[in-house]
């Protein structure tokens, strides 16, 4: 949890760098920076991602943000501004963390895809197909999920009704 731990607080960048060095020493070149506790904030995410992207250019990075405090989307945008391109998401925002009190799931796939679409960032993913899967997930679970897009719909749908 490089963005913050419920037990250790903020983790110094030097400790994170040491862990990354240890991974590289044994041949690991794909590394995920996870915010399972949902403690990360955009300026911290930007600074850390900029740092590791520059210091460790051979690493293939993944980012993993839980939306516990409602800032996962902003954290993704900050990471993208720092050059990161891969993010874990989940249908409907499912998930959680059994050892972090109150932890929400990952940010919903459809919310992130919609944000990218509306921002002109090509993902190659059909947001409506993802929404259909997330609706099926809700049906299977028997309750709503944390997807904003399933509640509000695509911006383009709203714009069509205004015209």
Q: PLM features: residue spans?
A:
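Catalytic cores and adjacent flexible loops of soluble metabolic enzymes
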Residues: 1-163
